[in-house]
Amino acid sequence: MEPIRTIESRTVVIPRENIDTDQIIPGRFLKVTDKKGLGKALFSDWRYDAGGGPRADFVLNGPAAEGCTVLVAGDNFGCGSSREHAPWALVDYGIRAVVSTRVADIFRNNALKNGLLPIVLDPASHAKLLAAPGASVRIDLASQTISLPDGSTASFPLDGFAKYCLMNGVDELGFLLSQEESIAAFETRSKV
C-alpha cells in the first residue's frame, strides 16, 4: 500500500446521493480476487452504454477527470452491501480520497484497509467542493485538513490507528507483522 501524507489534485465531482457499492462496481465484476484492472469496471453502468462504449455525459469519461485523484460525492457514499471490490476499483482507477458528508461504515473500513482515504466533511465545506468541480485541493493527512476552493480549509475526523496505517502505507496485518519483535519480547517477559 502506498503511504499517504498529502494529496494534491483537482477534484472530480459526482453529486449523486446514496451511491451504493453496486453502483461503484456492479456485482458481475465480483468474481475476481485480483485488484488489478478493476478500475475499468468503476461505475461501469454509468460510464458505459449497453454496447460497452463510453457515455459522453458521464464525468469520468471527460478530459476534466483525467488525473484527478480526489472524488467528491453526494451524501451517504458507499452504502449498500459490503464488497471490498468497491474500494479496490476506486484505488485501481487512481482515486486516493473520497469526500462526502457521510460515508457508510463498512465501506469506510474497507477503504481504509486498502489505502483509500474516506473524508467526511461538514455540509457547508462539502457544498463548496460540490459547487466547484475541477477545483484544486490539498489534503494534509497529518493535520487532517483539506483546502477548499475559497482558500479556507476544513478539518475531518479520522481514527488515530487508521491515520498511522495510511501515513505509513501498511494495513492492519502489515502493522502487526512490523511489531513481531516487540510481541515476542513481551511474550518472553510475560510468560504465563
Curated annotation (Swiss-Prot):
One of its GO terms (biological process) is L-leucine biosynthetic process. It catalyses: (2R,3S)-3-isopropylmalate = (2S)-2-isopropylmalate. Pathway: Amino-acid biosynthesis; L-leucine biosynthesis; L-leucine from 3-methyl-2-oxobutanoate: step 2/4. GO terms for cellular component: 3-isopropylmalate dehydratase complex. It holds the Pfam family Aconitase_C. Its EC number is 4.2.1.33. Keywords: Amino-acid biosynthesis, Branched-chain amino acid biosynthesis, Leucine biosynthesis, Lyase. It is an enzyme of class 4 (lyase). It comes from the Bacteria. InterPro entries: 3-IsopropMal_deHydase_ssu, Aconitase/3IPM_dehydase_swvl, AconitaseA/IPMdHydase_ssu_swvl, IPMI_Swivel, LeuD. The keyword tRNA processing does not apply. GO terms for molecular function: 3-isopropylmalate dehydratase activity. Belongs to the LeuD family. LeuD type 1 subfamily. Heterodimer of LeuC and LeuD. Catalyzes the isomerization between 2-isopropylmalate and 3-isopropylmalate, via the formation of 2-isopropylmaleate. This is 3-isopropylmalate dehydratase small subunit. It comes from Anaeromyxobacter sp. (strain Fw109-5). The gene is leuD.
